[in-house]
Amino acid sequence: MKYQQLENLESGWKWKYLVKKHREGELITRYVEASAAQEAVEMLLTLENEPVRVNVWIEEHLNPALFNRLKQTIRARRKRHFNAEHQHTRKKSIDLEFLVWQRLAGLAQRRGKTLSETIVQLIEDAENKEKYATKMSSLKQDLQALLGKE
């Protein structure tokens, strides 16, 4: 396993995820009967600061359809948590208009690169173009100076 599991922290994430899903109207319990489901949800709501009991609740009451999604969410959250510790792995966000993002995504796809790699490539292309323009301007001035002196 690449990232260390932190039981207490991850239980808090699981609790928040399940409460959010419940508030969004998803069935988070395995029970079909509304009263049993409501009772299990009320029990979950009291367990916010009890990580061990949150995990027991999940084993006993979680809707099987949510199990894989919960695991994937926690795995992604764990990765973001550990990557955020180091500057070079921390993700940054930028605001792009949708059409700009769409064009960038299309270019990245055509080049077979990630969005980040495509942005770096575009920056390098622009820098090379600047260097070329500066060099050509310098050569042009030198040529004019040579022709002007004769």
Swiss-Prot record:
Q: How does it assemble?
A: Homodimer.
What would be the name of the gene that encodes this protein? Answer: matP
User: InterPro entries from the entry?
Assistant: Arc_rbn_hlx_hlx, MatP, MatP_C, MatP_N, MatP_N_sf
Biological process per Gene Ontology, one example term: cell division
UniProt KW keywords: Cell cycle, Cell division, Cytoplasm, DNA-binding
Subcellular location per UniProt equals: Cytoplasm
HAMAP family registered for this protein in UniProt = MatP
Q: What is the role of the protein in this entry?
A: Required for spatial organization of the terminus region of the chromosome (Ter macrodomain) during the cell cycle. Prevents early segregation of duplicated Ter macrodomains during cell division. Binds specifically to matS, which is a 13 bp signature motif repeated within the Ter macrodomain.
Please give an example of a GO cellular component term from this record.
cytoplasm
Regarding protein family, the annotation reads: Belongs to the MatP family.
* Chief subcellular location: cytoplasm
Q: Organism, per UniProt?
A: Citrobacter rodentium (strain ICC168) (Citrobacter freundii biotype 4280)
Which Pfam families does this chain map to? MatP, MatP_C
Q: Name one GO molecular function term.
A: sequence-specific DNA binding
Traced from the root, the source organism's taxonomic lineage reads:
Bacteria, Pseudomonadati, Pseudomonadota, Gammaproteobacteria, Enterobacterales
Disulfide pairings:
none
The name on file for this protein is Macrodomain Ter protein
Q: Does the keyword Cytoplasm apply?
A: yes
